[in-house]
Amino acid sequence: AVLLKDGKVCVAIEKERITRIKHDGGNDSDAIQYCLDAEGIALKDITVVVQCENFTLPKRDFFKGKRLFADSNQPKIIDISHHLAHAYSAVGTSPFSDCNVMVIDGCGSPLDQFIELHPEQKNSIEASFFEINQMQCEKDSFYHFDGQKLTPLIKDFSVMAEQTSSKFQLPTTQHSIGGFYASISNYVFGDMDDVGKLMGLAPF
């Protein structure tokens, strides 16, 4: 969770830092409450929440319990795609006021969910993707940042690949550099989320 005030980061925390469980996910209430407590404010003081709720599935408790603001229509909640969240994270800590952003990911938001979230960006996607009946997810995205807004230039989607039962798993999306990197992580360390460790080996 990250708390912003007037466009500046006030406090940020990964849930795993609180629970001491590596890659801890699901319910985000602990991380949100930490940020509120750090600034001495309450939920009512928040204007808007921006989130990336990937792979929304019916009848599934994705958040593993009631969220901090589950019983209220305040603050306003805005959903954005997985790759757009990555892109804003990059420009938010970048010194550039005008730049291009490239996101290369193992697996981002599904195509149908992306269109539902950002219908105005449909023209950034090649028409042939809409002719494929299989599930497709964000693979590569290219944006332009003008100091205020991120505009998608090109978005590439890929069909989800079948996972194998062998130790060397296929990427989550076909033809994905990010997915391939995660698969190598799984081969070396037995976990597709250990890409940071794999990156740490690079100098050696």
Predicted segments, located by residue:
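Short acidic/glycine-rich loops and adjacent helix/strand connectors
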Residues: 2-204
